[in-house]
């Protein structure tokens, strides 16, 4: 198959919005021609320690709950709320819309792929680690 266009955004935790410090914790990728919407999200102990260094009073459970909500929206899980029930492209655009909350997406970027899942994994490795 020929390469198809995709869009992606990096998910960032911004523990104190007023300070602008951020930690990359995931990537959301959409490839419309392949009907693909996927996310890789990871907030392990090392990243939690980094967040606590930025904001000692951070509510880690709240962050984890919000990240789980994003996973559910991507999967179209009915427990993900009304946004999870939208069509794939609409869910992607809701997830990557600018916000001033603790979890923020980067600006949306584009690329070409023959394998959206492999591109998601590659971007995650490069941008989140």
Regions found by a protein language model. Give the residues of each.
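Polybasic/polar functional segments that serve as interface/processing modules
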Residues: 1-129
